[in-house]
């Protein structure tokens, strides 16, 4: 999870969920190393491939290639899920504490072909989300 969203008031949640802090500026590879090690040990991680909360909602924004690269490198299976109707707040603490009717839709469990590249995986995941949600693609 992006370090800036990991508010101290919720430290017990981050520890309980074994949430991996990620520096989104690309200067810290510790989170990536932990995630790769976890995947190689048959662990599970959750990734938001857009690299943050993007506006407008209801559109499929470009994905960063990190998720696809991790999948290609570790051969991990992907449980494609869509999170929707979350609170739209400027602060994480407000979003976490506001009552909502958020949904999580589990779309498919995907095993990519052995030779798939990170870019191919990223493109396919993005296509599948757009196909499932009927949301337009942002280029």
Can you name each region flagged by the protein language model?
Residues 1-27, 34:
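Catalytic core of membrane glycerolipid acyltransferases/transacylases, capturing the structured
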Residues 30-139:
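Non-catalytic C-terminal accessory region of glycerolipid acyltransferases
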